[in-house]
Amino acid sequence: MIMLEAVYHRMGQNWSYAYNDSTLHIRIRTKRDNVPRIDLHCGEKYDPEKYKETIPMERMASDGLFDYWQAAVQPRYRRLVYYFALHSDNGDAVYFMEKGFFDQPPKVMYEGLFDFPYLNRQDVHTPPAWVKEAIFYQIFPERFANGDPSNDPEGVQEWGGTPSAGNFFGGDLQGVIDHLDYLSDLGVNALYFNPLFAATTNHKYDTADYMKIDPQFGTNEKLKELVDACHARGMRVLLDAVFNHCGHTFPPFVDVLNNGLNSRYADWFHVREWPLRVVDGIPTYDTFAFEPIMPKLNTGNEEVKAYLLNVGRYWLEEMGLDGWRLDVANEVDHQFWREFRSEIKRINPSAYILGEIMHDSMPWLQGDQFDAVMNYPFTNILLNFFARRLTNAAEFAQAIGTQLAGYPQQVTEVSFNLLGSHDTTRLLTLCSGNVERMKLATLFQLTYQGTPCIYYGDEIGMDGEYDPLNRKCMEWDKSKQNTELLAFFRSMISLRKAHPALRGSGLRFLPVLEHPQLLVYERWDDNERFLIMLNNEDAPVNVVIPAAQPGASWRTVNGEPCAVVEESSIQAALPPYGYAILHAPIAGTAE
């Protein structure tokens, strides 16, 4: 019996959307393992009998409760009416239309059906194509490298000392320029910088001047030199924009502090009670969290809006930036972000607009605001399995399935997939110092679709608890670097860049019930297929996997000697926290 109460579909968002200017993706949800087959019946609404087709739907993902199905449709006239035929094991079918469930198909094709009115090109969410090929590297500027001691702040401490909330070590833009060859050799092709604008703190999220690089980092001209040097190496550059709030030394806020309601900037901020003060630790004005030094900007004010849009415009036009990462993006009004996107895309249609949001973000990812968000839900899925070891492989696969079904495919393709940042405990620390477990998490990140980001120093084995210890100085002494881990990162980045299948959407998890901590999955495209096995257990495992392509020329990559390929199966002996990556060309393609 089909469990109708589990069936779900609606127009729009991640259920019925334009993937590109000629293709629609239609999705439906059913109870897990309850419906063996679904057909999508669709047609042209103004002549449905002449232009109609039946498309078998594919199970695109599953989680603990549901299966998610998808069909791609290219309507000849860009319009579509449709309904679903859900088939049971006994041959019966249920027909699902906008009006509900029926035991017979519609007598008239266009009555009571779901309706996609028209595929307007302007409505298609089209993230920049380059982001799908990008591998980001996050740099916390104050801690990456000190290339110019002449701009060190007063009281600068010796490089490599213990970080605190308020100390400085002299990292700057020249230090980044000096190490661009290192980043090129690592293989990354995009850099994301924490804030660079003038501020009082070491993290610079308390902006004092949005039009000026902080003097301890360098000058505006030095940033232009850095951007040009990155572009010459094929690297993109993303800067952090803090538009939710400013710093307490931002001149308009200083004016409000001094003049209260008489300040011409009084409406630039969200003041609940005058005069501005802090009562029992709570400011009388809205802030980021309850930080008195970070007053929240009123982006509904036309002057504030014009000022911030000019900031976004200036740095793209003058410096040639490739996009913005938007801090605390979910606390800024949607209308401002719509205008921001329009202005940024007018200047550079290929600019990447990335929002910092740590929860479900569908309202911001419909093509009118952000291209992507920082995918912290993905982060937590990986950390709970590989680092904290709170879940098993089946639960991991189910959580990934929920994520895949939660967004349109083009959003998933550019989702910012990170394993750590300046706001999290370091990956190696979460893995209890176990480098092999850290490798497994990184391996999945770099063989999964989306846009991976590496937090500076993770590749050499840097550790650190939560802020401020996760913001240590980059270790440049090679004798103190984990060079074997660095070689692993370089190898995996190279593998990802060489094989489009590892960046595409083809994904299937293969359950191995006798080994609950063994994660096995396939990645593929039209030309090649990968089988990847990750043993997230402190004991060796021996596993036999039926070959997805019997007779295919499967080969291990990266020199793993642990897998034996036979005609109908693949046998692997994996050491504790070991892995195997196998590759085969699709039949009929060149190897």
Swiss-Prot record:
Site (Transition state stabilizer): D423
Binding site for Ca(2+): N146, D148, N151, D152, G170, D172
InterPro entries: Glyco_hydro_13_cat_dom, Glyco_hydro_13_lg-like_dom, Glyco_hydro_b, Glycoside_hydrolase_SF, Ig-like_fold, Malt_amylase-like_C, O16G_dom_2
Catalytic activity: cyclomaltodextrin + H2O = linear maltodextrin
Catalytic residues as annotated in Swiss-Prot or TrEMBL: D327 (nucleophile), E356 (proton donor)
This protein's record includes keyword NADP: no
pH dependence: Optimum pH is 8.0.
Residues bound to substrate: H245, R325, H422, D423, D467, R471
Induction: By cyclodextrins.
Gene3D superfamilies per the UniProt record, alphabetical: Glycosidases (3.20.20.80), Golgi alpha-mannosidase II (2.60.40.1180), Immunoglobulins (2.60.40.10), Oligo-1,6-glucosidase, Domain 2 (3.90.400.10)
Single GO term (MF): cyclomaltodextrinase activity
Assigned EC number: 3.2.1.54
Keywords: Calcium, Glycosidase, Hydrolase, Metal-binding
A single BP term in Gene Ontology: carbohydrate metabolic process
Thermal profile of function: Optimum temperature is 45 degrees Celsius.
Cofactor or coenzyme needed: Ca(2+)
UniProt-listed Pfam families: Alpha-amylase, Alpha-amylase_N, Malt_amylase_C
Cofactor note text: Binds 1 Ca(2+) ion per subunit.
Subunit structure as annotated in this protein's UniProt entry: Monomer.
Family from the record: Belongs to the glycosyl hydrolase 13 family.
Function in brief: Hydrolyzes cyclodextrins. Can also act on linear maltodextrins, with the exception of maltose.
Name of the protein this chain belongs to: Cyclomaltodextrinase
Organism: Lysinibacillus sphaericus (Bacillus sphaericus)
